[in-house]
From Swiss-Prot:
Disulfide linkage: none
Lineage, top ranks: Bacteria, Pseudomonadati, Pseudomonadota, Gammaproteobacteria, Cellvibrionales
Key words of the record: Ribonucleoprotein, Ribosomal protein
Assembly description: Part of the 30S ribosomal subunit.
Assigned GO CC terms: ribonucleoprotein complex; ribosome
Name by which UniProt lists this protein: Small ribosomal subunit protein uS10
A GO MF term: tRNA binding
Gene: rpsJ
Listed InterPro entries: Ribosomal_uS10, Ribosomal_uS10_CS, Ribosomal_uS10_dom, Ribosomal_uS10_dom_sf
Annotated family: Belongs to the universal ribosomal protein uS10 family.
Cited Pfam families: Ribosomal_S10
SMART domains xref list: Ribosomal_S10
GO annotation terms (biological process): translation
Length: 103
């Protein structure tokens, strides 16, 4: 796996969950002898929704909701075979989306 790079993108609604998962990946990669760059926090996407409270009248009565999508980026430089095996066996928390690309 010479001159390889593994890029890992993580997405989650809960920032504590994504930070814990990122820390677990970093510890696993370092334990197997790989060099890690990151975690790099990417911009948080904020989606806002405005909903009318009443079914008929009172246009002024509204509720506002927000969903925040937190993102992190990790680069594992020069991974070993042990690193790839350990990352495949790693069990992350539910609610964290993981995208892995080889470059």
């Amino acid at each position: 796996m010479q001159n390889q790079r593994i890029r890992i993108r993580l997405k989650a609604f809960d920032h504590k969950l994504i930070d814990a998962s990122t820390q677990e990946i970093v510890e696993t990669a370092k334990r197997t002898g790989a060099q890690v760059r990151g975690p790099i926090p990417l911009p948080t996407r904020k989606e806002r929704f405005t909903v009318l409270i009443s079914p008929h009248v009172n246009k002024d009565a509204r509720d506002q909701y927000e969903i925040r999508t937190h993102k992190r980026l990790l680069d594992i430089v020069e991974p070993t075979e042990k690193t790839v095996d350990a990352l495949m066996k790693l069990d992350l928390a539910a609610g964290v989306e993981v995208q892995i690309s080889l470059g």
